[in-house]
Amino acid sequence: MSIYDLIKKNIQSDGRLKKDFRILDEDVWKSNDDGQEDVQCLEYIDNMIEADIEGLLDIIFKIKDNNYDEIEKELEIYFENYRDTILIYREPLYKYFGKNKISISSLNNIYNFFKKMLTKSRNIFIIKISIIILNSLNLEYNIELLEIIKILALCSEFTLLGVLLIKTLKNIDINKEIYELAKKVYAWGKMACIFYLETNTNEIEDWILNESTEENILYNFGAITYSDKADIRKKLKKTSFKKNEFSKISFLIYSLLFLDTEKGITFLDYKEELLINYLELAKSIELSETDYLTIEEISSYMKDDIYYMEELGGEMRKDEYFFPLEISNKLLKECEEILNNRN
């Protein structure tokens, strides 16, 4: 059974796959979930090393309308031991097809073969390279191709590449397509959608905020992306909140403070405003355990920052401080005030 047919067979009545659906071989990709290898590269997707595509192009330009099986076998051999992200093929293939004049007959052969591979192949990397190559051809809107991509993209392993292709199509509502897909995928697939989703409505911002607590935000970049797209900075300027809304903001702030050695919050240019507004609101509303946990984390971080400034200040540059000393002391005092009044 092809991967496409496997995905299609497992689509539930709600249009989604089960959350535990997986196509990666656990014996080969033991520590990776579907989509992780590619989506975790989003942080530097526009500055990646580029694959040497000479060998791949040799295979591509052998394609004729009567040798699909032979070409598929060559591609299987080409990707047999491949374990890197497929994204390193994007730019060199985009550049090649964008700069070189290729005959109409060759382009037709390439298009027809790789479109066929989307629904026929049982090889993950052949499907991925097919999406990238089809994307490189600068296609006009094609409803049949779009429907195939939307089915493949339900699996997190293909979501990012599906979104990248959808983004290039013309005469469709791109953001609507990405939003609808985002609501059907999980984890790394959802992260891929949210990264490219334009949050041009309150509905989308609120949805992203709600989803942040449903998914495991596994690293800084994820926490930063969810926080920016949900626009928690803007939300903390409000005076009233929907049920659990403040706690969801707390969860994201906690994630920004807690994850990784290099805290995600340090990369925000509005971190001071964010924490000041958060703590000011926290003093005036009924708090949940999640809120208190976040405030404890802020307190801990401020204590560490104050220690480094007071004990090691002479050895540190000003830009190495999390906040100026007076701001850190102010935030710590507010944290202690809230925690001391805890019921």
Residue ranges and their predicted role:
Residues 57-127, 131-135, 189, 202-223, ...:
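Eukaryotic alpha-helical solenoid repeat scaffolds
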Residues 96-161, 278, 331-338, 343:
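Well-ordered, non-transmembrane segments within structured domains
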Residues 113-121, 145-155, 165, 177-185, ...:
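Alpha-solenoid HEAT/Armadillo-like helical repeat scaffolds in large eukaryotic proteins
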Residues 137-142, 172-178, 203-209, 219-220, ...:
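Flexible loop/turn segments at the boundaries of HEAT repeats in alpha-solenoid HEAT proteins
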Residues 179-266:
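Long alpha-helical HEAT/HEAT-like repeat alpha-solenoid scaffolds in very large eukaryotic proteins
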